[in-house]
Amino acid sequence: MLYYLHYYSGYLGILNVFKYITFRAMGAAITSLVLCWLLGRPMISLLRKLKAGQPIRGKEVVKDLAALHGSKSGTPTMGGLLILLAVSLSCLIWVIPTNKFFWLSLLSMLFMGGIGFWDDFKKVIQKKHYGISGKIKLLAQAIVGVVVGIVLLADPETSRLAQKLTIPFLKEVKHIDIGWMAIPFFILVVMGSSNAVNLTDGLDGLAAGCTIGVAFVYAVFSYISGRADMSGYLFLPYIKGAGELTIFCSALIGACMGFLWYNCYPAAVFMGDTGSLAIGSALGVVAIILGQELLLVIAGGIFVIEATSVILQVASFKLTGKRLFAMAPLHHHFELKGWSETAVTVRFWILSLLFGLLALSSLKIR
């Protein structure tokens, strides 16, 4: 909304800064960060009054995990509401309100946040341990993929890119035409991203910290893709209006930083499915809009590893009756092997940073 102030720069020159994406991106990050700081304690107090405490998985299933995390029982969850609120308000202040890519990303995030809230509500308020069914979550993620696909394919400006799969690090074979397979592929991306972040959200600060690096990578790619000069030089497709996603990603970065203030060990609040499903969906949708879906595998390497560990664990147990890991997702494996929770979290943050740098290096290594 503040973007329109630059039209009055003739009266007050400094207002011209509101035209620049970089300035508005910094403003969005700071705004969402401050909003999380200010709203964090009231939100946590409200969740405590509602008795929205997180039940600890493992008391009946994995006794060792229950022993490690038993003290967390009753910690308020659904803290993802804080992230959703901060991102939404920040973006409404700093993003051009007519930008279709912003609305597509934000509405997808809010929709999956609503599904996550429903799941958390059933778990912590209605005391139904398993929440909503996995089929409902998958259906919701499929709906996001289909809607995003229809919007992009119906628009002549984005239709061609939406049907092409961009290969990172390759200059000669940088696109593969997937045609009508685009929508099924988008569904897979949203499902994979949303569930991977959800699986990663098992330790204090882990998912939020890893999200910061991934969102930064896509903030950079959004900025470059939205500029004809820079995108041409770096062999990225030019997408008119994509620069506003830089602001969306920056708001997400700020919100995750602010949330970490309360979510770092020992956590005063958990994001729950309200936050993890929403964040994963948002990252997936941004990747789809930019045509950088495969880059998400690199930038979100920790999310991929966590999800893969669960898949391998289930497959191994069903095929051989043996488990590959002490427990899945992988962060619990290291906990049960003797690593402290903070050690696992910080080491995974470091790896996430390295994955982010590797993803950014694809801009020049071609």
Swiss-Prot record:
GO-annotated molecular function: metal ion binding; phospho-N-acetylmuramoyl-pentapeptide-transferase activity; UDP-N-acetylmuramoyl-L-alanyl-D-glutamyl-meso-2,6-diaminopimelyl-D-alanyl-D-alanine:undecaprenyl-phosphate transferase activity
GO biological process: cell division; cell wall organization; peptidoglycan biosynthetic process; regulation of cell shape
Compartments where found: Cell inner membrane
Cofactor entry: Mg(2+)
Gene Ontology cellular-component terms listed: plasma membrane
Pathway(s) per entry: Cell wall biogenesis; peptidoglycan biosynthesis
EC number: 2.7.8.13
PROSITE patterns noted in UniProt: MRAY_1 (PS01347), MRAY_2 (PS01348)
Catalytically driven reaction(s): UDP-N-acetyl-alpha-D-muramoyl-L-alanyl-gamma-D-glutamyl-meso-2,6-diaminopimeloyl-D-alanyl-D-alanine + di-trans,octa-cis-undecaprenyl phosphate = di-trans,octa-cis-undecaprenyl diphospho-N-acetyl-alpha-D-muramoyl-L-alanyl-D-glutamyl-meso-2,6-diaminopimeloyl-D-alanyl-D-alanine + UMP
Membrane topology: Multi-pass membrane protein
Keywords, in A-Z order: Cell cycle, Cell division, Cell inner membrane, Cell membrane, Cell shape, Cell wall biogenesis/degradation, Magnesium, Membrane, Metal-binding, Peptidoglycan synthesis, Transferase, Transmembrane, Transmembrane helix
InterPro entries: Glycosyl_transferase_4, PNAcMuramoyl-5peptid_Trfase, PNAcMuramoyl-5peptid_Trfase_CS
Summary of the function given for this chain in its UniProt record: Catalyzes the initial step of the lipid cycle reactions in the biosynthesis of the cell wall peptidoglycan: transfers peptidoglycan precursor phospho-MurNAc-pentapeptide from UDP-MurNAc-pentapeptide onto the lipid carrier undecaprenyl phosphate, yielding undecaprenyl-pyrophosphoryl-MurNAc-pentapeptide, known as lipid I.
Family statement: Belongs to the glycosyltransferase 4 family. MraY subfamily.
Protein name: Phospho-N-acetylmuramoyl-pentapeptide-transferase
